[in-house]
């Protein structure tokens, strides 16, 4: 008959264990809460950044659209940015077509003056439109020759 070796204390503890201790569950819960908090903070920053990038691209695209409409319809067009607002209007000078455009949530656009394109699509001056939110700011620029560019951080 073989003799059984006595088990050491730690082996006996492991053999009788049916689940996790309260301390182990609490440690895992704390680690998960910290990880979710960090992920949420990064997600908020990411969404703010994407809203800013989308809003800046939208402003540049709408400026190009107003310029192209001015050329195709042989009529001056204006783009008016309301002071620190998330809305702006594209209008045909002297009436006619009017479009109100809304920027993404928490994004505002400001310009020092009304952007005007002649009937040939030429800007009346060089313009810079600043687009901003809690993450930072970007800009859409119309140069004196009619080129339109935008920059985001």
PLM regions: where:
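Terminal low-complexity, poorly structured segments
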Residues: 8-10, 59, 99
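N-terminal single-pass transmembrane signal-anchor helix
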Residues: 2, 7-43
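Membrane-proximal N-terminal amphipathic helix
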Residues: 45-76
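Long, low-complexity, intrinsically disordered polar/charged segments
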Residues: 40-48, 99
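Type IV pilin-like appendage domain
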Residues: 76-128, 134-153
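Hydrophobic/basic alpha-helical segments enriched in Actinobacteria
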Residues: 20-21, 43, 66, 76-78, ...
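Hydrophobic aliphatic residue packing
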Residues: 23, 27-34, 70, 79, ...
